[in-house]
């Protein structure tokens, strides 16, 4: 937005206020980041980029912000706020750190079917994937870090924080 306002012919409007610089916040969601952007300027429209480039004056390089979005680790989010009767804000920037990820390997432990490995960011509470194994004449009772059930037990879809790669074995009764 150029900030131009309608004035009487022959007069020049002076812009005295600048839109508030956007605030970029990010939280880890799975193995990515969930990004939210806000501006304290009422009615401001926010444009952003995720490749580190500047959301330029014509906004041809920016995407209009309409709500939270997901971004891969290692990216840089930049944003600018624009509003009628205001000068454009300065550009905000947030570098999203690379995440250490760990994997859960699922073993059927006598059951049938398959499950893909599940990736989780280090130290982030994430639900274990829902069991997809089956075993004729048996009921799935949860997961365990040992095939014999004498390790650490987890309920189906329980939230856990990983600090290393683990293998979970389906438990049956």
Predicted regions and their residues:
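Conserved "repeat-terminator" motif of extracellular CCP/Sushi domains
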Residues: 14-15, 97-107, 133, 152-173
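Short, compositionally stereotyped local motifs that mark structural "simplifiers"
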Residues: 1-104, 110-111, 160
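Extracellular modular ligand-binding repeats in secreted and cell-surface proteins
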Residues: 29, 35, 69-73, 109-141, ...
């Amino acid at each position: 937005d150029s900030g131009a306002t309608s004035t009487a012919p022959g007069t020049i409007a002076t812009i005295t206020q600048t839109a508030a610089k956007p605030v970029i916040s990010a939280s880890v969601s799975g193995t990515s980041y969930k990004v939210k952007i806000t501006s304290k300027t009422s009615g401001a429209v926010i444009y952003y980029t995720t490749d580190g480039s500047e959301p330029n004056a014509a906004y041809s390089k920016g995407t209009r912000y309409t709500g939270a979005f997901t971004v891969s680790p290692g990216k840089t989010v930049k944003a600018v706020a624009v509003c009628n009767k205001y000068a454009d804000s300065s550009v905000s920037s947030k570098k999203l750190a690379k995440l250490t990820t760990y994997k859960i390997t699922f073993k059927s432990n006598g059951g049938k079917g398959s499950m893909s490995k599940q990736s989780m960011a280090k130290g982030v509470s994430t639900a274990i994937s829902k069991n997809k194994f089956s075993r004729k004449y048996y009921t799935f009772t949860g997961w365990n870090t040992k095939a014999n059930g004498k390790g650490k037990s987890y309920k189906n879809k329980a939230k856990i924080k990983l600090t290393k790669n683990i293998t979970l074995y389906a438990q049956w009764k």
